[in-house]
A protein has these predicted regions:
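Short, structured coil segments at secondary-structure junctions
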Residues: 49, 93-94
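Bacterial N-terminal signal peptides
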Residues: 8-17
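Early extracytoplasmic/lumenal segment of secretory-pathway proteins
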Residues: 24-88
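Sec/Tat signal peptide C-region and signal peptidase I cleavage site
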Residues: 17-23
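A structural signal for short loop-to-beta-strand junctions that line the ligand-binding cleft
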Residues: 74-79, 96-101, 105-136
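Bacterial N-terminal signal peptides that target proteins for export
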Residues: 1-8
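A generic local structural motif
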Residues: 11, 63-67, 121-123
Length: 136
């Protein structure tokens, strides 16, 4: 539940617009994975904020992100990327760096974002929201 709260808090901040004319594009991996994101927090936050979320599937990597930046035509707002792509994209200036306590509001209980988010992730350009592991 804490992870879901973090995701919703992040999306609430990023999408803190009250006009229904606003839309955001979220890019993810497609299939059941994207559908779970859409149903779990995309649809609820879109309804709560009265906005539209456009979902786009991609196959990973940084090439499409680089092409958008080089063309000056960035159309993606939130991107689900692997940790290594986050590190490389941040180092290459493809992503925005966050100051977690300045750029994000505190949690409902007052906890600052730097203490509430997965800020130990390998980049200042990302808010970690998906954890997984392989068990052998």
């Amino acid at each position: 539940m804490k992870t879901l709260s973090k995701i919703l808090l992040t999306l609430s901040f990023v999408l803190s617009v009250t006009t229904s004319a606003f839309a955001v594009t979220v890019v993810s991996w497609g299939g059941a994975y994207t559908e779970s994101q859409k149903l779990g927090y995309g649809d609820p936050i879109a309804k709560a904020l009265g906005i539209e979320i456009n979902w786009v599937d991609y196959s990973g990597g940084l090439s499409e992100i680089k092409a958008q930046k080089e063309a000056g035509a960035i159309t993606w707002d939130i991107i689900d990327v692997f940790a290594m792509d986050t590190i490389n994209g941040c180092d290459e200036g493809l992503f925005v760096e966050f100051d977690f306590d300045k750029d994000f509001p505190p949690a409902p209980d007052g906890t600052p974002a730097s203490k509430d988010f997965f800020t130990s992730m390998p980049s200042k350009c990302a808010v970690g929201n998906i954890l997984y592991s392989w068990n052998y």
